[in-house]
Amino acid sequence: MKSIVIAVTLVLFSFCFAFGETEAPTKDDAKALVKQAIAFVKQNGKEKFFDEVRNPNGKFHFKEGTKKGLYIFVYDEKGVVLAHGVRLELTGRNRWNDKDPDGKYWIRDWTDLVHKSGSGWIKYKEYNPADNNKIMNKWSYVELLDGMVIGCGIYE
């Protein structure tokens, strides 16, 4: 009887951990969010899109579940922030000359990428706002639409 109680307790305990954990967002999640953003801007226009990106309770912000931490960012082709889902203070700032801690011009890299192929993935280092602004590797999926570089990234 004692071993049955212990076994049941262990099973229940493992369920608590399983349901309490959330998986990190995936590259597929980030890419899907960019695709949703592109569909939204095509249907609603740039200004409504920018407002939705900046809205902390909008459809391009995930605060829980497996997509927790995902958000959209939008730049023009010269590195100016048009909308940012987390760092609203960046709006209007030109980040063309910003480098990551390794000296990589990541804005230039993703602009080159979207001009060559229309979309793709770039890896660089960036502050993670969901993890006390810790510098982490970040993979961002970016896509070009009407002079806008629309992206979403995941941290490693």
Regions found by a protein language model. Give the residues of each.
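N-terminal membrane-sensor/transducer module of prokaryotic signaling receptors
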Residues: 4, 18-156
